Amino acid sequence: MKMPDPARRERQRALIERGIETPFFRDHIKVFDKAFGEMEAQLGKTKWLASDMFTLADVEITPYVERIDRLGLAQMWEDRPLLADWFARVKARPSFKAIEDFPPTDFYDDTGRDGLKDWPRIKQMIAA
């Protein structure tokens, strides 16, 4: 599949090839941090993101949170206990099994280690 936007394609390629060294990584990680803050605030009001029932809102954001987790960056919610609890409840759902089975876990072994190694620098980027 060809990505129609050449600029987006180049950003994606740079992120894959150079990771946190790309000039726009800081912007991307700050978007996640802001979203996680908003999720924490909402979870102070409701059990799930849109209500007290599991809804499409939870389904839609789960792959993004799961990706951050697999990249070894779960520290992003270490000070967000409601988000951590939400994600634990999502992972406990039978429907989450399909996400865990794809792609093969060895794909994330190196990226997870890199995320843990790079966390101090990433944390500084978020704070800046």
Briefly describe each language-model feature range.
Residues 84-128:
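Long, positively charged, glycine-interspersed low-complexity recognition regions
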Residues 1-88:
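GST-like fold's C-terminal all-alpha helical module
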